[in-house]
């Protein structure tokens, strides 16, 4: 188990927006909207006439649409992680050729982030009814299988060659997790499903002018697996998943 104090990380755009909402609601005064406070990290455009009318009818000082949220790294208090890594390697040389096999599995069993002062302020505001219960506060408490932190990840690799021929096979598994920023109508969290891909290649080595050369034909994502749907910026977690689908490549190499 690893415990890190004063971990560095991002507070999160959603949480910054909630902080901005709290400041606006706590300082809301229709008699003098110029005194309303807001987060310096949230930039808005000027509200139009219809937006101003809607805000005033709701008893809230007008605010324009958000055009930019600035994030910076900060201390996020204590983080606790525990789990294990499993690795298996095997190689063999026989009449069928040379074989190399590897399997790596990572299992995360605990991943917790203690709430620092910024998170505590959001929690207290929600408990006091300043912000709705339906708005999720993310980035603290139990983070296991939440927002891009799957419990299990695995990679497999098999390489074979004999004479001039070679073959490679690769597998990847990224376990499921849940998005805390999205809730279904029944209150449950949005499930980002597990992601599995298989890729491979076949190549042939040849001698051209006494130099080693190689021609390789490969297929990435043989099963045409698509990234599971999520509310991240590209519609999926680009740092975890790939949405290119099946694609082929031809690689020619020549050593001078």
Regions found by a protein language model. Name each.
Residues 82-86, 152-156, 196-202, 246-252:
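Hydrophobic, lipid-facing positions within transmembrane beta-strands of outer-membrane proteins
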């Amino acid at each position: 188990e690893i415990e890190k104090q004063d971990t560095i990380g991002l507070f999160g755009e959603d949480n910054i927006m909630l902080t901005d909402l709290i400041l606006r609601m706590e300082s809301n005064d229709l008699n003098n909207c110029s005194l309303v406070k807001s987060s310096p990290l949230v930039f808005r455009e000027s509200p139009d006439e219809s937006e101003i009318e809607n805000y005033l009818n709701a008893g809230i000082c007008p605010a324009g649409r958000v055009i930019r949220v600035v994030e910076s790294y900060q201390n996020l208090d204590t983080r606790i992680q525990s789990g294990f890594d499993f690795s298996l390697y095997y190689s063999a040389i026989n009449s069928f050729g040379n074989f190399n096999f590897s399997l790596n599995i990572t299992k995360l069993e605990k991943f917790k982030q203690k709430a620092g002062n910024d998170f505590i302020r959001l929690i207290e505001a929600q408990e006091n009814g300043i912000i709705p219960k339906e708005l999720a506060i993310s980035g603290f408490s139990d983070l296991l299988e939440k927002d891009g932190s799957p419990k299990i990840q695995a990679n497999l690799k098999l390489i074979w060659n004999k004479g001039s021929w070679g073959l490679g096979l690769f597998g990847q598994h990224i376990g499921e997790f849940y998005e805390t920023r999205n809730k279904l109508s029944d209150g449950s969290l949005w499930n980002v499903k597990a992601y599995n891909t298989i890729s491979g290649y076949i190549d042939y080595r040849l001698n051209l002018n006494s130099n080693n050369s190689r021609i390789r034909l490969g297929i990435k994502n043989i099963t045409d697996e698509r990234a599971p749907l999520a509310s991240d910026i590209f519609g999926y977690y680009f740092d975890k998943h790939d949405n290119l689908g099946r694609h082929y490549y031809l690689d020619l190499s020549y050593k001078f």
